[in-house]
Amino acid sequence: MLPTEVPQSHPGPSALLLLQLLLPPTSAFFPNIWSLLAAPGSITHQDLTEEAALNVTLQLFLEQPPPGRPPLRLEDFLGRTLLADDLFAAYFGPGSSRRFRAALGEVSRANAAQDFLPTSRNDPDLHFDAERLGQGRARLVGALRETVVAARALDHTLARQRLGAALHALQDFYSHSNWVELGEQQPHPHLLWPRQELQNLAQVADPTCSDCEELSCPRNWLGFTLLTSGYFGTHPPKPPGKCSHGGHFDRSSSQPPRGGINKDSTSPGFSPHHMLHLQAAKLALLASIQAFSLLRSRLGDRDFSRLLDITPASSLSFVLDTTGSMGEEINAAKIQARHLVEQRRGSPMEPVHYVLVPFHDPGFGPVFTTSDPDSFWQQLNEIHALGGGDEPEMCLSALQLALLHTPPLSDIFVFTDASPKDAFLTNQVESLTQERRCRVTFLVTEDTSRVQGRARREILSPLRFEPYKAVALASGGEVIFTKDQHIRDVAAIVGESMAALVTLPLDPPVVVPGQPLVFSVDGLLQKITVRIHGDISSFWIKNPAGVSQGQEEGGGPLGHTRRFGQFWMVTMDDPPQTGTWEIQVTAEDTPGVRVQAQTSLDFLFHFGIPMEDGPHPGLYPLTQPVAGLQTQLLVEVTGLGSRANPGDPQPHFSHVILRGVPEGAELGQVPLEPVGPPERGLLAASLSPTLLSTPRPFSLELIGQDAAGRRLHRAAPQPSTVVPVLLELSGPSGFLAPGSKVPLSLRIASFSGPQDLDLRTFVNPSFSLTSNLSRAHLELNESAWGRLWLEVPDSAAPDSVVMVTVTAGGREANPVPPTHAFLRLLVSAPAPQDRHTTPTGSSDPILTTATPAFSPFTLVTQGRAGAGLAAGSPWWGTVGGVLLLLGLASW
């Protein structure tokens, strides 16, 4: 988080040209890194998006010195490749870029998805095709306004999706129109001004292109001064004399006049005007920087930083049982929250988002969200244990509500002493935790002496907490059982879990009687903690030198041990010895063991499938792999950096191991191939259909070596799941008007064999939702389509989040694990009508609402699969080749 809110007062574009733009002579507007197999050396939409975001982030850092650290100097970044790791290490410290890179990945994947999703890839308004320049501009500025609305409503996931769609259209303008051919050297001055008419547009009767029978068409454009764009495909049909988009996938380019004018890539087979690709990329980058800067100006620095997660800090999310017996637990939550707020206030680690959801049978909620720590503390302080006490409670419903409002990559803490009354939600909540990539930790005070607090209507099952264990396992979290007198001490893990720790993989992953748990420590790890909880008789920890330490409290040869009932925490002395460590535990049951550490080296990962039948080749993003599909795993290593010692060797990762969950059996090893320069940390692996043939959860472990050849071992923070079918749920651009009836589109496909499926729909809050598809019988490689209608009542609150869930599960004779699709929407009040006035040279652009159109905003497989591909393609320039253009006062 940035230290203060600084009013925006940026100079105009001509006043702030800090660095010279420099692109290589062979540098696309293809979607993502997979596109480069077809057109090597091209600049993708992801490149442009990420580069623009880094430019604006650097400018923000230069203007606001970091708290407690030396200010950044522009000269330190001149002539170097601009990397998020370097930028964030200079501002916040090493290992602080993970959240930013994840947020930027969301924007980039939403951008790339516009070329793949069925209702956006062929819409000319979303790509500035077919001379629909006015309509395209309306959709562009509408998406930017929706980005602002969603960001102010604290729905940053939706804001990033709308921002990605806006940037895609903006970048396409410079590749699909003839703006570059007209000799223009700057972005279009009116494209982000909805009140300014676009001038000199070609009309229907104006011929724009001549016939070209070659792949490369440098002279097919008729030399006039009117603005035009190419037609793609057959809808709408290309009028006589008009330009085509052109390229391998464009059926209109075979009709006279043949050829086309797109500048998407360096390949003449895809881009007839490939020779102008570099100029188009320069202008698209400039325009993207302007769009990011516009959002910064409209939102202010703090909200803009939250939009892109320009912070190493996590969010703080509590789900609290408020039944009468929960007084101690509620007080423990208050103490930890207060401690966190006070300890981190004004620092980079101050939480950026606060979520609070109470529950008390028979109800749950409402959800409280804020970015203000004082408001959160005030709301939390008003919560007290209420009457009642029946076991069980509506815990999973409350957790589902918290997941809906908690940002990705966050920790959620559940305080309760009751089992779930809504256990039927277990699988759905498991999937939602993986879709949101949130880790859930349950703090359960199971105190049998507390009979006066909990009225028990029946003998309680010893398995009643199994749903919590399932959700914790799926999310990478824990279930920690404790007692009243220890809850305040055990709750201290709230703060420790939010300290950007990584969880070290154990072999085996669960305690096996008589067998030690083994984990590896490398030179990049520090502040190692071991947590052990359960009915423990004894344990010991042994370092690589054979030195061991038992369960005795206090200081020991390896570190310091604290005990709170049946919960132990061992904090190892720094620096820890590198090599193989062991933990031996003797217990009556299956104890929980977790080893965590701080490190600058971590990784993000995404899944996708190669696509070759859209407007461009590329990678179709998936949240989870689908059984039977050849899938690409894309890994983005964070914390590599290059600024401190540019000449030093970088860590190298060679392969990834897939393990079954929870037993830990190895399913396979897959080699990793580097993508682009090693300092980018981009790796890819091909997961075969054989490896992904069975629907099941699995974990990912990254294996490699450090610069000295010592073993590196990192694990993904939570498991992934192979889902049995592909489930896509599409809707409007993400915004709902009160009183409207909104169509949604559903597609389900099987790639692993016949499937007999029942489909169920849910919506939160309880709006009316109808569907014309309740069952589906699918053969191999067969799809089914359905339509849903969501009715938004007049009473729907503006800025409220709506989540639609579709579940596809096997019938009784065909027990297939369920697959879930999630669609997030936002209720938004209509924007006031703008006055049609001409802006002065010193005013900011005004974002107005475009007419909503039916276009998908998310793709899901057991979750929303806008979350697939990681960072873009090979680097195309150095920071000596980056433009910082932050002023928008003249817009």
UniProtKB/Swiss-Prot annotation:
Q: What are the boundaries of the region Disordered?
A: 237-272
Q: What SUPFAM superfamilies has UniProt attached to this entry?
A: vWA-like (SSF53300)
Kindly list every residue the record annotates as glycosylated. Answer: 55
Q: Which UniProt keywords apply?
A: Glycoprotein, Secreted, Signal
Give start-end of the signal peptide. 1-28
> Which residues belong to any copy of the VWFA domain?
313-506
Instruction: Quote the tissue specificity entry.
Output: Expressed at low level in different cell lines.
Principal location: secreted
Location(s) in or outside the cell: Secreted
Q: Which Pfam families match?
A: GBD_Hemicentin (PF23560), Ig_VWA7 (PF23619), VWA7_4 (PF23610), VWA7_N (PF25107), VWA_4 (PF25106)
Q: Does the keyword Secreted apply?
A: yes
Q: What else is known?
A: Found in the major hispocompatibility complex class III region. May be implicated in susceptibility to lung tumors.
Record protein name field: von Willebrand factor A domain-containing protein 7
Native species of this protein? Homo sapiens
Report which gene this protein is encoded by: VWA7
